[in-house]
Amino acid sequence: MNDLNVLVLEDEPFQRLVAVTALKKVVPGSILEAADGKEAVAILESCGHVDIAICDLQMSGMDGLAFLRHASLSGKVHSVILSSEVDPILRQATISMIECLGLNFLGDLGKPFSLERITALLTRYNARRQDLPRQIEVAELPSVADVVRGLDNGEFEAYYQPKVALDGGGLIGAEVLARWNHPHLGVLPPSHFLYVMETYNLVDKLFWQLFSQGLATRRKLAQLGQPINLAFNVHPSQLGSRALAENISALLTEFHLPPSSVMFEITETGLISAPASSLENLVRLRIMGCGLAMDDFGAGYSSLDRLCEFPFSQIKLDRTFVQKMKTQPRSCAVISSVVALAQALGISLVVEGVESDEQRVRLIELGCSIAQGYLFARPMPEQHFLDYCSGS
């Protein structure tokens, strides 16, 4: 572990002494200390940066919350460990605030301080620093000419991520996702090209390429005895096209596939200011027999409004609720409520982002039946997906 600057923010002198003494035994580098937020701000200004701030929340003078806000604005603090005993609901709200401020939350230290707990949190910090993916700078994104060339050369490929039954892993369907087989950079996810496509109105061209590839795969699945439903992501900009439903119908006819074999996923945020033509397209698709899914349900601010106004046949619950089940008790209440909502509306529910068996078991207890996530399968190219579906 490299040398670290660790700041202990604690107003109770004995607790601060215990923490500093323990940290000096296990942390290579400098251990700084402050009795309140004002002292901590002064330390930040003098030392340049702090790798980890161990922060008590309830202090006289400038408290921990005010210090965290200042730390975010200064850009001089990387990670935060809480050392306050607070109500679980307040704790979760504080964690959310820390993350919204752009700070990395490592965990709770609790009181009294434990050397074993400090060591575990330092190990977590080191692991996150090593594994943290580097943010893609705009300058590193491919040029529009490169993206257009890739589209013209057929370098964008449909990948498939299964939707499965939680209680047995049986295949229910799959989502079709985009990957770019770049000739020099290898397989690239959407984070490398979607921004350019959205900026230069290339999303529609990508959609039709993926849709054609997906329908060809769906026909092969039928031949394998696996006539499952495939879901395609529709960008909000496409919904205003009067020809969208008509062109989808034409391709389904060309591939001799029923409309019920496909579903279209639309994010809630993409429907906030949807024009009448968008609603017309969605109604036409549902009349044809296609499925419609509200993607990332719960991630925005108007999920229930959208669910009432648009003819959805499926809800895809945003992955954040699954990720927070263990640390935020209210997430479980939200999930069980969405289960009841889907049942009352007579539509299906897919839970996204399932990554552990512990999550799978808890979701079953909450009434969920269909899920998608790395626990079951990562997105895969066509041949791997066909092998997956045939059990080979």
From Swiss-Prot:
Species of provenance: Pseudomonas aeruginosa (strain ATCC 15692 / DSM 22644 / CIP 104116 / JCM 14847 / LMG 12228 / 1C / PRS 101 / PAO1)
Regulation: Phosphorylation of Asp-56 probably induces local conformational changes in the response regulatory domain. These structural changes are transmitted to the adjacent EAL domain, then the signal is further transmitted down to the active site. The phosphodiesterase activity is inhibited by Ca(2+) and Zn(2+). Phosphodiesterase activity is inhibited by a benzoisothiazolinone derivative that specifically inhibited RocR, but not some other phosphodiesterases.
Domain notes: Contains an N-terminal phosphoreceiver (REC) domain and a C-terminal EAL domain that possesses c-di-GMP specific phosphodiesterase activity. The EAL domain contains a functional active site loop (loop 6), which plays crucial roles in stabilizing the overall protein structure and participating in catalysis, and also controls c-di-GMP and Mg(2+) ion binding. The response regulatory domain is involved in interaction with the Hpt domain of RocS1.
Purpose of the protein: Phosphodiesterase (PDE) that catalyzes the hydrolysis of cyclic diguanylate (c-di-GMP) to 5'-pGpG. Cannot use cyclic AMP or cyclic GMP. Part of the RocSAR two-component regulatory signaling system (also known as the SadARS system), which regulates biofilm maturation, type III secretion and expression of the cup fimbrial-gene cluster. Negatively regulates the expression of cup genes by antagonizing the activity of RocA1.
A Pfam family per the record: EAL
Effect of E352 to A/C: Loss of activity
GO BP terms, alphabetized: negative regulation of DNA-templated transcription; phosphorelay signal transduction system
Modified residues (4-aspartylphosphate): D56
pH dependence of function: Optimum pH is 8.0-8.5.
Limits of the EAL domain: 140-392
Superkingdom per UniProt: Bacteria
Enzyme Commission number: 3.1.4.52
Subunit structure: Homotetramer. Exhibits a highly unusual tetrameric structure arranged around a single dyad, with the four subunits adopting two distinctly different conformations, with only two active sites accessible for substrate binding. Interacts with RocS1.
Cellular-component GO terms for this entry: plasma membrane
Reported impact of E265A: Loss of activity. Activity can be partially restored at elevated Mg(2+) concentrations (up to 500 mM)
GO molecular function terms listed in the Swiss-Prot or TrEMBL record: cyclic-guanylate-specific phosphodiesterase activity; metal ion binding
Chain positions recorded as Mg(2+) binding sites: E175, N233, E265, D295
Known outcome of mutating E355A: 1.3-fold decrease in kcat
Substitution effect: E268A: Loss of activity. Activity can be partially restored at elevated Mg(2+) concentrations (up to 500 mM)
SMART domains, alphabetized: EAL, REC
Keywords recorded for this protein, A-Z: c-di-GMP, Hydrolase, Magnesium, Metal-binding, Phosphoprotein, Sensory transduction
Protein name: Cyclic di-GMP phosphodiesterase RocR
Cofactor: Mg(2+)
Record domain Response regulatory: where: 5-126
Free-text disruption phenotype from the record: Disruption of the gene results in biofilms with an altered mature structure but does not confer defects in growth or early biofilm formation, swimming or twitching motility.
Active site residues of this protein: E352
